[in-house]
Amino acid sequence: MHILDQVDAASLKQDIPAFRAGDTVKVHVNIIEGSRSRVQVFQGVVIARSGEGVRETFTVRKISFQVGVERMFPVHSPVIDKIEVVTRGDVRRAKLYYLRELRGKKAKIKEKRDN
């Protein structure tokens, strides 16, 4: 098992900001189309974070043209260029799956105040 731990440690990213459920993030994703590559930004609210180490993932939800879109990202994926935290959310839950049923202003998350 020690060899697997070393391989896992080698593939961990170091430049990941601290974020949790309720935070609004911008995820910069590298997309390769044929011979060209471009960066696509996916901005939304983190509704869940699960796993640990190399297998850690997080789910981001956004509303696009009145349709909810959720995307799951591995935290340490080489496809992710960078993760920016836009705002910090003030929530009391680790998983915000209840946001799927809420519409409009009810789906808004309060911003955490800095003291």
UniProtKB/Swiss-Prot annotation:
GO MF annotation terms: structural constituent of ribosome
Keyword terms of this UniProt record: Ribonucleoprotein, Ribosomal protein
Pfam families for the chain: Ribosomal_L19 (PF01245)
GO cellular component, one term: cytosolic large ribosomal subunit
InterPro entries: Ribosomal_bL19, Ribosomal_bL19_CS, Ribosomal_bL19_sf, Translation_prot_SH3-like_sf
BP GO annotations: translation
Family designation: Belongs to the bacterial ribosomal protein bL19 family.
Known role: This protein is located at the 30S-50S ribosomal subunit interface and may play a role in the structure and function of the aminoacyl-tRNA binding site.
PANTHER family xrefs: LARGE RIBOSOMAL SUBUNIT PROTEIN BL19M (PTHR15680:SF9), RIBOSOMAL PROTEIN L19 (PTHR15680)
Stated name of the protein: Large ribosomal subunit protein bL19
Originating gene: rplS
